[in-house]
Amino acid sequence: MVNHKGEVQSLGKKSEKCYSYYMNNIESAKEFATRKFAEVNVENHFLEVYGFLKEDFKVNDENILVAGLLHDVLEDTNTTDEEMSEKFGQDVLNLVLEVSHVKNWKDPTRPEMTKQDLMSEYYEHIREIPGRAKLIKIADFTSHMGNFIKIYQKNEQHLYPKFVNNDKYITQIQNFLNSCEDSLAKEKLWKLTVELEQKNRLSAFNMLD
């Protein structure tokens, strides 16, 4: 006869093993991203994006969380698709690819495409990506919007002219959100875009005084 208590203990050990594997993947992704960005001397907000996904949006899909940590790695470092796939699996790679644009906004296979062309193409692309990838992009944009608002709060907009009064960027994000299913994540980001719009208008008005 199987001892019920023994079954519970066995299930408990399996659960602990799964949790340990889950955390090892998360920690491995944090270490990987930290090392890759250090190699190219670039600061990145990947921990903040991870925080929005896990704490604010209550995401428990491990691959989404790992991809959130790695979402800029292909764009901004020398990491290859093969390297990421081998270390974190094809699903994580696919999620990161969905939210990534070409490096430095230059496509060597289409030299005639300008940066503006590629950016327009990218914002059209993210409207069509799967919902799991959209969650990562919402977290990414949420981080950016929050940081832009902090610039205004610190009255430092003169130090970051390209990050403020950028109504086109806000419109692109809102167009993206219109393609997303309703969620608390979508609502949070939408409110931030509206707040930044208001700060942009106030800043422009003050410049006229």
Q: Where does each model-flagged region fall?
A:
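Active-site helical microenvironments for divalent-metal-assisted chemistry
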Residues: G12-D209
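Acidic, Ala/Val/Gly-enriched low-complexity intrinsically disordered segments
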Residues: V2, E7-V8, E16
